[in-house]
Amino acid sequence: MSSRLRLKGFVRAAGVDTGLVTVFCRHTSASLTIQENADPDVQADLNEFFRRLVPENMGWLRHTSEGPDDMPAHIKAALTDVSLSIPVTAGRMVLGTWQGIYLFEHRSRPHARRVVLHVAGEPARRYRAREERSQEDRP
């Protein structure tokens, strides 16, 4: 399942009609990106671009205690985004047809990653009606 599908379920469960979903990566050697999701070559090309832009064996790096891929991963994360904001309209994220949300791992080996999701906005009508009924029941 793609990240986009998991986010759709999160937004739906939040019951927001109009608002904003924030996606935040809690790491300094990974980032988030919105990119084309139809052709896997896009992801391969992006990975290759960043590998060439920030290679692992730059002799001038001082932060090397966590391995040769660690400081280049920090630099790649600094060049990209650790958070994304996506508008929500009519209970759905407003993304282009070919846009997908990806966790961009910058280390050579995969690591366990945590992403924080937050939705803020106006509740959908079905939730507003339920909330109004529950307030009427209060003394």
At which residue positions do the language-model features occur?
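Active-site histidine-anchored catalytic micro-motif
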Residues: M1-P139
